[in-house]
Amino acid sequence: MEDINFASLAPRHGSRPFMGTWNEIGTSQLNGGAFSWSSLWSGIKNFGSSIKSFGNKAWNSNTGQMLRDKLKDQNFQQKVVDGLASGINGVVDIANQALQNQINQRLENSRQPPVALQQRPPPKVEEVEVEEKLPPLEVAPPLPSKGEKRPRPDLEETLVVESREPPSYEQALKEGASPYPMTKPIGSMARPVYGKESKPVTLELPPPVPTVPPMPAPTLGTAVSRPTAPTVAVATPARRPRGANWQSTLNSIVGLGVKSLKRRRCY
């Protein structure tokens, strides 16, 4: 049997496989030994039991008995109870005082008006003396009394009034009358109305160029063919076959399916 090289299957660090007795993975020799919680808990229990045994020995010794007798003579147990009771009472009294002070403070705040409604003294404004130079006052001239006349200015004003006479009736007719009566009172839309003797003005323009080429004149020996209009195909809607009964209507919607033919043959 050939030897199988298991080193190729082992994990590698570069080109070196982690396989052999030189490196034991997962044992207590890895990184100084494995950490065990059971050993820690057993160590704590051993330490507690040793302290308990030492305390029992000290309590049951002669020194412990003398200490207990001395404490009993001094009523140490009663003093401890009284101290605890006084401490609890003191804590309760302090809590009651703090609660009463808080209640009194809230009552005083409710009786007093809010700060916004209290009359605050106006702020003191520092008076600063500033010398302002006012412009000199213009003295208006005294008004003349009723008996005195108003002095005239140096330049006298003359008022010239020009009067124009209205034009005569004939001149107004010549200037404003239109030569012909108008159809509409609006100036931009008005057109003059001509009499019967006037002739309409026409523009002499050349005849228009025909867009369709002229047809040749027919001769005596040839028959004239009339132009025929192009035929236009009109799409007519297909009529749906109407069934005589509901079965034919259903067959037209669903279909008849595969047609089958039954024949009886004798052999």
Curated annotation (Swiss-Prot):
- Which domain of life does the protein's organism represent? Viruses
Where is the region Amphipathic alpha-helix essential for membrane lytic activity?
A: 34-54
Q: Where is this motif: PPXY motif?
A: 166-169
Q: Where is the composition biased (Pro residues)?
A: 205-217
Propeptide, residue positions: 1-33
- Mod. after translation: Ubiquitinated by Nedd4 following partial capsid disassembly; which might play a role in intracellular virus movement during entry.
* GO cellular component terms, semicolon-separated: host cell; host cell cytoplasm; host cell nucleus; viral capsid; viral procapsid
Q: Where is the stretch described as Binds to importin alpha/beta, involved in hexon nuclear import?
A: 257-267
Keywords for this entry?
Answer: Capsid protein, Cytoplasmic inwards viral transport, Disulfide bond, Host cytoplasm, Host nucleus, Host-virus interaction, Late protein, Microtubular inwards viral transport, Phosphoprotein, Ubl conjugation, Viral capsid assembly, Viral penetration into host cytoplasm, Viral penetration via lysis of host organellar membrane, Viral release from host cell, Virion, Virus entry into host cell
Q: Where is this region: Interaction with hexon protein?
A: 48-74, 250-256
Q: Where on this chain is Nuclear localization signal (motif)?
A: 149-153, 262-265
One of this protein's GO BP terms?
lysis of host organelle involved in viral entry into host cell
Q: Where is the composition biased (Low complexity)?
A: 218-230
Site-annotated residues for Cleavage: 33-34, 256-257
- Region: Involved in endosomal membrane lysis, residue numbers: 36-53
Composition bias, Basic and acidic residues: 123-135, 146-155
Induction is noted as:
Expressed in the late phase of the viral replicative cycle.
Which parts of the sequence form the motif Nuclear export signal? 67-76, 248-259
Q: Where is this region: Disordered?
A: 107-184, 199-230
Q: What is known of its domains?
A: N-terminal amphipathic alpha-helix domain is essential for the membrane lytic activity.
**Family the entry assigns:** Belongs to the adenoviridae protein VI family.
| HAMAP family (alphabetical) | ADV_CAP6
What more is known? All late proteins expressed from the major late promoter are produced by alternative splicing and alternative polyadenylation of the same gene giving rise to non-overlapping ORFs. A leader sequence is present in the N-terminus of all these mRNAs and is recognized by the viral shutoff protein to provide expression although conventional translation via ribosome scanning from the cap has been shut off in the host cell.
Give the protein name, as stated in the record.
Pre-protein VI
